[in-house]
A protein has these predicted regions:
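Terminal accessory regions of large proteins
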Residues: 4-256
Length: 256
């Protein structure tokens, strides 16, 4: 990847400078997210979409996410999981043969220990949005729906592709599915605790406490999302990021 990172990127002309490899890799990740949403395309220069009529013919090499919702979870629960999509992006650009090597290169540049996909996932959960806010000077074009400190649910949408039914889609297709997973996992843990040894019970009980806290958090969050989903809110892009973000502030990450 060191030799190839000048690929198709114009946000894109990412040339790796040894002075700050981490910054360049974060720029590549930002560009990849732009491609996932269709803001950028590997097939056309500059902006591919920033509002108006959608032109699917601009996207051949890497197809944008269909519903404009990219879940950011602690595991690959959804088909359009953001880490899974990023891995696919790297594979499309640099090839399958060097995929693992390139993911390792990216993970090492981000810093941290562990498997490359885990490091990349941790960056999306904990670092990506802060970087996005810096780049866009607290006027984010990607919006982070965030349930809270327990990380029970997060997802990104692209503001310019927002539709009145976007919130309802987040609720029914993602939050409800995640709630179901928590219920299943909690029931499973309770069963395992009943038949576990004393030392194993301590470990499983800690996991159960964490899951129950996440389930409580997402239940409260679902109620907030439900309220907004029912309103089918329309936004006007001409009103600007700050005005539109404020409408959804109760369910979006705080801008710091």
């Amino acid at each position: 990847m060191q030799d190839e990172l000048t690929s198709e990127v114009e946000d894109k002309d990412v040339t790796v400078r040894k002075a700050d490899l981490g910054r360049e890799i974060r720029s590549l990740i930002s560009y990849a997210v732009g491609c996932m949403f269709g803001r950028y395309s590997l097939d056309v220069p500059g902006l591919a979409y920033a509002g108006g009529a959608w032109d699917a013919s601009k996207y051949k090499t890497f197809i944008p996410d269909e519903d404009n919702v990219l879940p950011i979870c602690d595991d690959e629960y959804f088909e359009d999981d953001i880490v899974g999509r990023f891995v696919k992006f790297v594979e499309v650009i640099y090839g399958k043969e060097t995929l693992e090597e390139n993911l390792r290169f990216i993970a090492d540049a981000l810093g941290g220990k562990g498997p490359s996909r885990k490091i990349i996932r941790n960056y999306f959960i904990n670092g990506f949005y802060a970087d996005h806010l810096k780049v866009y000077q607290k006027r984010p074009i990607y919006w982070l729906f965030d349930s809270g400190k327990k990380n029970s649910f997060k997802c990104l949408i692209y503001m310019h592709r927002y539709q009145p039914d976007t919130i309802a889609r987040i609720r029914t297709d993602y939050i409800h599915e995640q709630q179901s997973r928590y219920r299943t996992a909690i029931a499973d843990l309770k069963q395992r605790i009943n038949g576990a040894s004393t030392s194993e019970k301590v470990k499983l009980s800690k996991q159960l406490t964490t899951l129950q806290a996440q389930a409580d958090e997402i239940r409260v969050y679902e109620e907030k999302i439900h309220h907004l989903a029912d309103r089918m809110i329309r936004i006007d892009l001409d009103d600007g990021v700050k005005h539109n973000y404020e409408i959804f502030k109760d369910v979006l990450a705080k801008i710091k």
